[in-house]
Every structure is written in C-alpha cells, then in structure tokens.
Amino acid sequence: MSVNLASQLREGTKKSHSMAENVGFVKCFLKGVVEKNSYRKLVGNLYFVYSAMEEEMAKFKDHPILSHIYFPELNRKQSLEQDLQFYYGSNWRQEVKISAAGQAYVDRVRQVAATAPELLVAHSYTRYLGDLSGGQILKKIAQNAMNLHDGGTAFYEFADIDDEKAFKNTYRQAMNDLPIDQATAERIVDEANDAFAMNMKMFNELEGNLIKAIGIMVFNSLTRRRSQGSTEVGLATSEG
C-alpha cells in the first residue's frame, strides 16, 4: 500500500524549505548577487557531499528500498569535478578543502548508510529534486552574476536526462511506490528536514566572504525581506 511519500516529503519539509530560501547567501544568489570565491567553496562542499551520497547509493543499488530510486543519471560528482577544475585549475584536488558544515553533512550520510540505509531516500530527495527543479534558472543566474562564458555551471546540466520535468514525475512516482510503512515514511521526512538544516549550515558559513565582497549594508538590503517560500527554485535544496 502506497504511503504517498513524495507528498509527505513535500508537505513535511515546507517549513525547512522556506527557512533555506531565507538564508542570506541563498537570498543574495536568487537576486543575482554571487561572489565567486564563496560560490566555489560551495561547489567544493557539494563535491564531497555528492561523492559520499553517490558512493553509498551505488553500494545499495540492489537494496529492497533504495533500488527503486537508484538513478545514476542524476549523479553530480563528475559535473562538480568539471566545475572545480574551472574555478581552481588542474590542481583543484589539492586546493579544495571541506568546511566544518560540509564534513558534518558527509558524516551524516555515511552514518545513515551504515545504520539505516533507507534514510538515504531523504538525502537523495533533498538534493536531486532541487537540482532538477531550479537548475536552468540557477545556471543563468550564476552565468550572469559571475560573467561566466565557457564553464563553471556543469553542476546544473543533466546530460543524460532529456526531459527534466518528466524525470521529476518519474522520480516522485518511484518514491510513492517504495515498499515502506508509515513509520518509515515519517523517519524519512524527519531525515529530510535534518538534511535541509545541514544545507543551511553550509550556506551560513559562506556569508562572511560574501559580506566582505559586497559590504554589510548591501547584504542587509538584499536579505531584509523574508521570502514566503513560494519559488520552486531550490539552491541545493529540494523543491519543497
């Protein structure tokens, strides 16, 4: 019997989604204010997070639950490697360092995989649906804000997915068809909210560099008004 997990996740993470949209770094990004050094640090953190998540998902590709949402065409690790080479150069593996919040996120993904792998559903949902929902819009914002012409936005490009909207529907249906009970669904929703919180901590770490670049007065003017969470653009968070 279906527990309509996709709907439960959408409803159960609405507050977290709104909170994520109101982090200063995200609000500035959505308004077209992106500081390159802060952004490349975010790309670095995402590289470590996706590397961990995709490694663990691959381990469980035959899992009775996770096998239903194992879509390697979603994988972002290689795209992030392209972007890191763009921002840091060929020596990027020696240059990129994970932040404290990024490490906490990776540690949680590893812990879940080791103790309750079904909760990886929450991390997959939180990351990939956001990527699919706002990818093209966020790509254009990044290109315009940082004057990018020849790279730096591979993260937002899904070369192996022809129709992103149709794929999102397929993904949601796969979540709804997962062989889980209501108690497990509730644990997945709780984990998704925790994933949102971990994303927000990564964003908060970046605000110092952004403020130094644009000034506190500009930052405050851009972040003063609270968003109502109506947009489906998810900067590294699910569509909500």
Curated annotation (Swiss-Prot):
CDD domains in the cross-refs: HemeO
Pfam families: Heme_oxygenase
Source species, domain of life: Bacteria
EC numbers on record: 1.14.14.18
InterPro entries (alphabetical): Haem_Oase, Haem_Oase-like, Haem_Oase-like_multi-hlx, Haem_oxygenase_CS
SUPFAM superfamilies: Heme oxygenase-like
The entry's keywords: Heme, Iron, Metal-binding, Oxidoreductase, Photosynthesis
GO molecular function, one term: heme binding
PROSITE patterns in alphabetical order: HEME_OXYGENASE
Reactions accelerated catalytically: heme b + 3 reduced [NADPH--hemoprotein reductase] + 3 O2 = biliverdin IXalpha + CO + Fe(2+) + 3 oxidized [NADPH--hemoprotein reductase] + 3 H2O + H(+)
Chain sites annotated for binding heme b: 10, 17, 125, 168, 172
Transmembrane segments: none
A single GO BP: heme oxidation
Intrachain S-S bonds: none
Protein family membership: Belongs to the heme oxygenase family.
Function: Catalyzes the opening of the heme ring with the release of iron. Key enzyme in the synthesis of the chromophoric part of the photosynthetic antennae.
Name of this chain's protein: Heme oxygenase 1
